[in-house]
Structure formats: C-alpha cells, structure tokens
Amino acid sequence: MADRVMCQELATPGSHYRRPKTGVPSTNVVYANGGGSWRAAPRQTQRLPRQTVQQYATGTPATGSAGRHSGRAFATAGATEEQTVEFNGAAVMGLPATPRTTKQARNKSEEAINDLLTRIPDIGKLFDVHSRIGNGTFSTVLLGTLRRESHLPDSLRRKFAIKHHIPTSHPDRIMKELQCMTKMGGKENVVGIHCCMRYDASAAFVMPFMAHDRFQDFYTRMDVPEIRQYMRNLLVALRHVHKFDVIHRDVKPSNFLYNRRRREFLLVDFGLAQHVNPPAARSSGSAAAIAAANNKNNNNNNNNNSKRPRERESKGDVQQIALDAGLGGAVKRMRLHEESNKMPLKPVNDIAPSDAPEQSVDGSNHVQPQLVQQEQQQLQPQQQQQQQQQQQQSQQQQQPQQQSQQQHPQRQPQLAQMDQTASTPSGSKYNTNRNVSAAAANNAKCVCFANPSVCLNCLMKKEVHASRAGTPGYRPPEVLLKYPDQTTAVDVWAAGVIFLSIMSTVYPFFKAPNDFIALAEIVTIFGDQAIRKTALALDRMITLSQRSRPLNLRKLCLRFRYRSVFSDAKLLKSYESVDGSCEVCRNCDQYFFNCLCEDSDYLTEPLDAYECFPPSAYDLLDRLLEINPHKRITAEEALKHPFFTAAEEAEQTEQDQLANGTPRKMRRQRYQSHRTVAASQEQVKQQVALDLQQAAINKL
C-alpha cells in the first residue's frame, strides 16, 4: 500500500498555487535581447498531434536540440500555441506548444514517464504526466497536471514539477532534501513542496513548476540593474537557507531558476544540502573535545603503572602470556612471537588497566583452570633462569657501547638513536609505541617527502573526513583542500563564481576535471601566496610547483567582456616592434598591453572607455571570492554592500522625484518657494530697521 501525503490545496479543485513572493518587488520593465520593452506576438491557435511538451521547470535544464530550442520558445511566451498531446491514450488539451523534438528525446521522455507510473502507480491516479523536463544523476523531473483540472482551460490549469528519485538513492539523502523544502521552502526565493509520494523503494516530490530561461541564453545580455537584481535575489535565498545552518552545496546557475519576463527567482535542488552546527556550538564542541582529551591523557598518566606496554615484552613475557591464556603449545608461541615483531600501520586503542579481568590473546575473558595454574608453578624456576640469562646478555652488550662512547664522543647522538630503536621489539627502526596520542601523531613532522616510501608519521595520522560534494567549478578552496570544518561560506563562493561569470561573460569560468587542476586554476587567478596562507590557516599543507602573482579582477572582467576589441589584429600591430615581435608577460601569459597582473609594470591599454560596472561591483566580487573562508563575506553582509544599498537609495530618490513631478505639484512648489523668498526679504528689511533704531538709542 502506498504511503501518500496529499496537501489540501491539491485535493481542492479550482484552488490555485500562488507563486512565492521574491525578496525584492518585481519591476514593470522587462528586457528582451539586452534591453527595450517586451512585446508578445499575436496569439495563434493550431492543433498538433502527438507533440511532446518541452518547458523549463525545477531541476536540470533539458539538453540536446530540445534544450536549445526551448529557450527560443520561452522567449516568445506570449505567442503560446494550443495543441493536443496524447500520453497512454489520454488526450490533454491546451498545453503550450514548443518546437518538435527528435525521436530519441521523445523516446527518453516516454521511458521516464513509464518508469514513474510503473514504480509509483498512485501518480497516474492523481496527475497527468506529460513529459520529462530535466534529469540529473540522482533524479528525473517531469511535468504534470492534476487530473481533476483537465476540464479547465490552459490558463487556469496548475502545472507541477514531479521529481522522481532513482531507487538507488540513499534514504538519508531523500529525507534531508524533504526536510529542507518543508522547513525553508515556499518563501524568500526557495522552492517549496506540495506533497511527497512513496511506493516501496521509490519516492517522488511534487513541487511548484516555474518556467524559466536558460542561463547561457541571457547572461551576456544583462545590464547592471538586472545583474544587481539577479545577485540580490540569489543572496536573499542564500541568507534564508543559512539562517537554518544549512549549506546548499550545489549553488550554480542551473539550480537558481530565473524567469526573465516575470522577474521571478527560485533556488532548487537540495539533494546535497548539509546541516552544520552554529559557530557557538562548534566552539563549545571543540572545547569539550579538548577537555576530554586532557582528561584522557591524565588518566593515561595515572594508569601508567597498571598498564602493560606490549612493545617491551621479551620472549619470556610472550611465553608467560601464552601460558596465562592456557596456550602452552609451541605453535602458539611462535605465532605470538611473530605478531610481536609486526609494525602497526595505525594507532590502536590503549591497553586495558590491570584491574580488569585478564584477557587471552584471542580477546576472550575466562578463569584459569587449576591444571594451568599447576603448570605455571612448575615453570616459574625455569622462567627465572631465562630472565637472569637475558639480563647478563644485556649487560655484556652495554659494556662495549660505553667503551665506544668514551673513544668517540661525536657518535653519542647516533648511539642514542640506536638505543631507542633497540628498545623497540626485534630492534625495529620504527617507533611502535601505541600510547602516543593522536595529536602528537598528527603534529609530527613528515620525513617521507621526495622518498619512495611513506613514513610512520603519515601512517599514524588520522584519516581526514571532509565533504567534497558539489559541482566542479563552484567548489571553494576549503573543499578542494579537504578542510573538515566547512561552513555556509561554501555557498557564498559559488555565488561569487556566478557573479564572475556574468561580469566577464565567460560561462563556465572554472572547468577542471579534478581537484588538483581546480586548485591550479584558482592559483592562476588569485596567486600562490593567498592559497599558501589559507592552507596554513586551515592546518593543511599544499605544495606548488611555481609561484604566481594575483590578477586584477577588473582587468580580467573587462578583457573577457570585450575580448573582440582587445584581441583585434590591428591593436596588436600597433604595439609590435620593428621585427614584428611583441613582448609577453611571463605571469599572465598575455601581451604586455593586455597584462592582467595586479601589480603590472607595463603600460597597458586604457579601460575607462569600456567601463560598465561601478567600483562597488568589483569590491563585492573580491569579497565574495575571498580565498580564506574565515574572512569571506556572508550572504547577509553582502546584501548590505554599497553595490545594493547605493542603488536602492538612488531608486528611492527617483521614485520620489517622479511622484512629485506632476504639473499641479510643481506649480504648488514654485508658489510656495516664491512666498518663502518674499517673506524672507521683508524680514530682512524689518531687521535692518530695528538695528538702526538700536544704534541711535545707544548714541543718545
């Protein structure tokens, strides 16, 4: 029996979903093709048999030829066409028409619909599923409408995005995404959820549908006011998510939907979302961990006398352990002796105190039988003789060492090291002391650099567990460096990368196949010193093959934005020398007149004529892309940046001027100003007369 949770809003016919209000009121001015006013084409009506609907919705945008043409279809959203679509024998009237799709795309859409209806049969009882509108690694998004609203016209029918999770998705992943949308969704540009349906191992989310533009279709056509509105709404959504101490972890243009005509925004896809502890809880937790570690060290020091260091056990001790455990065979003694010579790869737990019941080699606790006790009493004289022989042998070995120390005092440090290695079992050169704390092992200096083997210090270190989830190209340096204590600054870096792509008109800006190349790309832009300092602050070590100076973000954005101008052959010819060569900067690998370095010594081509962004935009970009996550600006602080606040004040002033700019109000203002000036002149005359009278009185 399917577990089904339905909202009353869906169950009630005729009720309609109201789109969530954005953080910023929408404006009436809508830009098409970079500017101007929006004009819709005249409405046309025709009937197209068996046409698959391709619309934008929450999730990954459609790929292939369907994805390329769908942007054009939405660009003329006013010219919607009515059609008849047939799915599984059911005809749906009045859906918006789109260009024809290929046979392969149609087959994939039908396969996705059949898979959804097969795995969750109750979906077909409530919804008419029309087409696949997006797919990802862990889910597929389909377009659906309510069956009970099939009699309504297209303008009154509600559309839903049905996200079908693949059966192999982990339940925790589905639960986290459901919790995020339930707690945070439906406001502040964050996607909400209507209901969740489950059948056996399959689950589906029913979410509001929002038609949107593809990022690659509009990011080069946005002007400064539209860029400001886009980034403001993105930061509004991130601020709302971060209030719940949640990291989205997958902020990118395809997950931040934007309807350019209606100026609507929506942050979707919380499949990688992660809850983090607030800063106060993290600091208290770390303090508690330090206190617990200190208590453990104190207990270890107090129980040193009661513990039995395994690395100092001799052959006689190994035999004694075997006898205590009831294992007196020669085979067991040989096996124990071989195990005592093995080197541990990782630190193990401390040995239990002596007051605990004695354990056998296999770890079992039991009482010694009487026969074993009798054998122990018989073997005690033999054991004493063996111990005396071992002491005599050790004294004989120490005598020549003392003589050599007197003859060669310079070799004393080397002999001290030899004594330390001799104290380990079987004379091994590795330190096998298992009571070394984990902190000491992690802080130990590595000695295996540029060697063909791995040192024990590296083997004794704890494994680093750091989340690396996210889309390549949008992951910050702390994720690439595997820093375990990651915060919501991860999403702020991704927002900065989106801002950089818009300002430079380069999408995607970072594109690396692995983490090492991704770090190299960041080093190329921000320099090696910033990465080294950040790695040191995060207690990470990074090795770079060469040094690199940082680049100027303003030069970078304008050079890319007007790449056709600065890469013109005529411009290059004007800077060439007599022999036809042109000097190239060694750091940024650009011609000297196009040098992008922050501290460039070259006389570069002026950029003031091509400037299109205010200085506050570059300052905000620099703070969003701060390498050190502890110094990076938050979403709430970014919304208070002058790039947004100065524009809001200017807009408010313009609105006040427009409100007070009617002819009647202007005439009233001129009349009031004239009366004020006339009154002020009369007051001046009266004051002058009073001053003259006062002067005459003083003379008398």
Swiss-Prot record:
Its EC top class is: transferase
Q: How is its activity regulated?
A: Activated by chif. Inhibited by the synthetic compound XL413.
Which keywords fit this entry according to its UniProt record?
ATP-binding, Developmental protein, DNA replication, Kinase, Nucleotide-binding, Serine/threonine-protein kinase, Transferase
Question: Keyword Nucleotide-binding: yes or no?
Answer: yes
Classification from the root reads: Eukaryota, Metazoa, Ecdysozoa, Arthropoda, Hexapoda
Task: State any single GO MF term.
Answer: ATP binding
PANTHER family noted in UniProt: CDC7 KINASE, ISOFORM A-RELATED, OVARIAN-SPECIFIC SERINE/THREONINE-PROTEIN KINASE LOK-RELATED
- Which residue range or ranges hold the Protein kinase domain? 127-644
Q: Which family does it belong to?
A: Belongs to the protein kinase superfamily. Ser/Thr protein kinase family.
Q: Which GO terms describe its cellular component?
A: Dbf4-dependent protein kinase complex; nucleus
Entry EC number(s):
2.7.11.1
Could you describe the subunit structure of this protein? Component of the Dbf4-dependent kinase (DDK) complex consisting of Cdc7 and the Dbf4 ortholog chif. Interacts with chif (via the processed polypeptide Chiffon-A); the interaction is direct.
Q: Where is the active site?
A: 250
Q: What does this protein do?
A: Catalytic component of the Dbf4-dependent kinase (DDK) complex. Phosphorylates components of the pre-replication complex, including Mcm2 and, to a lesser extent, Mcm4. Phosphorylates histones, including H3 and H2B. Required for DNA replication and mitotic proliferation, including during the endoreplication and amplification stages of DNA replication in egg chamber follicle cells of the ovary.
Q: Where does ATP bind?
A: 133-141, 163
- Please list the GO biological process terms of this entry: eggshell chorion gene amplification; embryonic development via the syncytial blastoderm; endomitotic cell cycle; mitotic DNA damage checkpoint signaling; positive regulation of DNA replication
Q: Does the keyword Ubl conjugation apply?
A: no
Q: What induces it?
A: Post-transcriptionally regulated by 20-hydroxyecdysone (20E)-induced let-7 miRNA.
Q: What happens when the gene is disrupted?
A: Lethal.
Q: Which reaction does it catalyse?
A: L-seryl-[protein] + ATP = O-phospho-L-seryl-[protein] + ADP + H(+); L-threonyl-[protein] + ATP = O-phospho-L-threonyl-[protein] + ADP + H(+)
Name the chain's protein.
non-specific serine/threonine protein kinase Cdc7
Q: Which organism does this record belong to?
A: Drosophila melanogaster (Fruit fly)
